Amino acid sequence: MSSGFSHMDGDGSITMVDVGDKKDTRRTAIVRGKVEMAPATLDMLVKQALPKGDVLTTAKVAGIQAAKRTWELIPLCHPLFLSYVDVRFTVDESLPGVVVEAEARTTGQTGVEMEALVAAQVAAMTIYDMCKAVQKDIVLRDCRLVYKSGGKSGEFRAC
């Protein structure tokens, strides 16, 4: 029984993909998401006037740490040697809120999409955590892979 899913064996049971015979290639993944909040909350974030301190620096560190621990959080992910992880933020008053962008890179046998996704989501959740004292209805949305390269499937760019 072939499901087409790489994490299922012939019997339909889950399995960790064997990447042992795959060639090492340079791999990159970029993920983007949004954290929407009230203009007043965004203003406090920009002015570093929130009770918990410097939101974006804390969120950046949290996202980078999370990327490095992805294999511990997602059951069938491989532990990877990440050569680069970054989390970047753009304040967007038209949202209003913050656009979170996470990038992960490696040279290896499997991709870094999950690491970039986890980095972006944890960074966004950290922004929520640090702002929730002044606003509870902050919205995390539209987190998605926008670019990947490397491996057998090659390059992907979201429309």
Curated annotation (Swiss-Prot):
Active-site residues (renumbered): 129
Keyword Calcium attached: no
Biochemical pathway: Cofactor biosynthesis; molybdopterin biosynthesis
Highest taxon, organism lineage: Bacteria
Catalytic activity from the UniProt record: (8S)-3',8-cyclo-7,8-dihydroguanosine 5'-triphosphate = cyclic pyranopterin phosphate + diphosphate
Keywords: Lyase, Molybdenum cofactor biosynthesis
Pfam family, one: MoaC
Keyword match Lyase: yes
Top EC class, one word: lyase
One of the GO biological process terms: Mo-molybdopterin cofactor biosynthetic process
Binding site residues for substrate: 76-78, 114-115
Enzyme Commission (EC) number: 4.6.1.17
GO terms of molecular function: cyclic pyranopterin monophosphate synthase activity
Coiled coil: none
Record InterPro entries: MoaC (IPR023045), MoaC_bact/euk (IPR047594), MoaC_sf (IPR036522), MoCo_biosynth_MoaA/MoaC (IPR050105), Mopterin_CF_biosynth-C_dom (IPR002820)
Purpose of the protein: Catalyzes the conversion of (8S)-3',8-cyclo-7,8-dihydroguanosine 5'-triphosphate to cyclic pyranopterin monophosphate (cPMP).
Subunit organization: Homohexamer; trimer of dimers.
Family listed: Belongs to the MoaC family.
Name the UniProt record assigns to this protein: Cyclic pyranopterin monophosphate synthase
Species whose genome carries this gene: Oleidesulfovibrio alaskensis (strain ATCC BAA-1058 / DSM 17464 / G20) (Desulfovibrio alaskensis)
Name of the gene encoding the protein in the UniProt record: moaC
